[in-house]
């Protein structure tokens, strides 16, 4: 019978599996005890002969044999062979159990579709399922020793009630050398056809449903017969059995304790009893016994299939289904949860145990409170950032408002807040850049040239004049998508040499003393939803804060410079007015106004770079970011 130990291991505890070691039926001890006893007896005999019966010369010869066997014991690949063999046997055993044959579906379909409360309808239902179970009995008689002992002849099958005497006569009329498992199935199909003709089965579809379940049951039994007919090739079990037993026969010599003083392989400790070799014998021999017991699960081992119990279960249950269970559904009434919220009940003891319902691991993560909208944009693809054939085509953008119910009101982790808060951070950076530089509107739906399109004309700053060089080409000292700022040698200096206060756009001048240079401030300057801009924002967000800091430092230094220049000019003006008097005051004022316009401090003539230098490989990977040509 099958040894059931599921209750003993239902709860995992440190001593759970150790309790299984105390069981005898179906255990590893019962499987290997005989072989282990024989091996230990032979080992003891050889040890006694070596220690007492051999002279010194013979002992040296015996010790050399021990050394030879021990050094070459690894030549037998025991782990490899046992691993593959046990895997093949376990897979075969699992499939045989899946198709062993449970007749429940046939009983349910027959009770559902073979209608009628008459005695004739009842006989149709009972005989259809009984014939199917009769076929299973005939199959198990030929493949299971336990079932064969139960039903040694067909007369015993008739006596058990699975076959009627007149049915046995009809069965015996068919005489040929092959098995006749198909006969009961043919009888069952004939009954379904007759029931359809007499109207007991209401439609052809219902007849097909019943017949399909019978066919599935028959197919499973056919596969069981096939597996019994063609087992695993006999060479494989022979090879494994030979390897395991040969290995431990060699161990009888290889694992002997060498006690001679002059021996090179003298054992450090003479334990007399081979402890480690005994453990190895139990493991390897037990491993092989597992495969041996599962090789044919229809035998009489402790853990083989309970074919007789399955036959009893099937015939009892299926007759109950089609007879007493037929058309006896309870009256249709309102359930206890009618118009009420379902609240399952527990026993008082189990109600205190918390449950872990089926729920996504991140289903409780919500948006932070400071996120009010989410901008949905197409995915940026480096390989094809723009739509082929339409490089200026704008992508579809959707802004989704965030409902209060979608926001989190508690702390859900720093990582979530940081990742979702980047939207607000980018918006704040964009506003700072807009205030610092008077550039075109960032959200421009027209298809004109902007910073982000990488088509901005090259610009040049020289003193108080700035040129736009139309048609200039990119070179290695300039970039697009940039912020342009001129500064002095060092913002940390107290005074910066300059001659004018604010840069102005000039026309038509090229070739200044200090050629115009600029650098990248990242694509946050433009938010036109292009693929290049979206990709740069995500990759270069860490550069923004240093750039903003440098811009603010530059503005602060420029403001201090203008204040100092104006203070000096005011002092000079007051001194001159005191010297010349009131008569020439009006003329002096006019001259001073002109002088102030000429001497107004301009931005530093030496360019000041903002941003982080891009690598040469990155410039080549993005053609639209290649630097423009130098001014001539």
From Swiss-Prot:
Residues 623-632 have a biased composition (Basic residues). Keywords: Cell membrane, Chloride, Chloride channel, Ion channel, Ion transport, Membrane, Transmembrane, Transmembrane helix, Transport. Its main location: membrane. This is Bestrophin homolog 24. The chain crosses the membrane at residues 28-48, 83-103, 234-254, 271-291. Residues 491-516, 562-632 are annotated as: Disordered. GO terms for cellular component: chloride channel complex; plasma membrane. Forms oligomers. Forms chloride channels. It comes from the Eukaryota. It is a multi-pass membrane protein. Belongs to the anion channel-forming bestrophin (TC 1.A.46) family. Calcium-sensitive chloride channel subfamily. GO terms for molecular function: chloride channel activity. It is found in: Cell membrane. It comes from Caenorhabditis elegans. The keyword Lyase does not apply. Residues 563-602 have a biased composition (Basic and acidic residues).
